[in-house]
Amino acid sequence: MENKIIEIFIPGPAGRLEAKYFKSKKNTSPVALVLQPHPQYGGTMNNKVVVETFNTFKENDFSVCRVNFRGVGKSDGEFDNGQGELADAAAALDWIERENFDNSQCWVAGFSFGSLISMQLLMRRPEINRF
């Protein structure tokens, strides 16, 4: 079966989170979470930098997820000044780790506001190996 990028909805603290997901064929592949720029300035998971980062992880055989924060696209909720978005990122990381429990490494990446949230997540989650 060919691996494809699929649309998923991850249960989040403010409702469901719209995401795109690619699962590597290797069970022990590294995982990556890619986060969007600032939602109040038009940032979405479809931002060019986010998509290119996602594709780079995919091409390097990662299982990778990019997610729209609360209130963006088809995600439920509304902007929460970074606190809620950090909780959204944690929920997305929990989801990708459950889907890939044998992962060899855990990476987070983001663009602009997404980098800020990634860094905050990194400080709270010891399983994250790379930023």
Name the predicted role of every residue range.
Residues 89-131:
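Primarily recognizes the serine-hydrolase "nucleophile elbow" in alpha/beta-hydrolase
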Residues 10, 16-101:
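Serine-hydrolase catalytic machinery in alpha/beta-hydrolase-like enzymes
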Residues 1-8:
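A domain-start/cap signature at the N-terminus of enzymes
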